[in-house]
Amino acid sequence: ENARDSLSMALYSALFGLLVDRINACLNPVDDDSGPSTRISILDIFGFERFESNSFEQLCINFANEQLQQLFTRHLFKQEQREYEAENIDWRSIPFEDNQGCLDLFQSVPHGLFSILEDEVAVPRATDLTLSDKFRALLGTNPHFCPARRTPLQFSIRHYAGTVGYDTAGFLEKNRDSLSAGLEALIEGSGHCLLP
């Protein structure tokens, strides 16, 4: 089942990349740096997710949404306000919630959620429980991280869109998510034009 899912994701990613490359080649057929080019970028993402049971997939989707929210916040509020100040434009400060702290919870090195997860994947005897214990030990004081009291595999994150509870069951296996050597050889040997 994991091999099937990994293969599906790799094929989807390759097909998606091929589609974007082909569209861009049609929009800008001349490889010329003399003028502005026409390109298209496609963002394929789910919206913010909060289900009764949330796992690694929802964590990744919600992290991507946190990044999009920060991009919006940075452009609309932070950048515009700096420009107004630089140009001495009279304006009224608009209060906004900055989600950088939540992004830091995910991205900080070495004690961000993803960094801890990557380190734990490399540990031969790591389990979902040892991962959860490391999250609690290293992230427990972060205001955006809330360890569950009664269930050791669960924690919550205070996102910009609300608090979401996650279950670490399967985090390690899903993060490994690599194609086996046999599947890679099968794809490479297929000779199909859509396969890398």
Regions found by a protein language model. Give the residues of each.
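Long, cytosolic, alpha-helical-rich C-terminal regions that act as interaction/scaffolding modules
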Residues: 41, 50-196
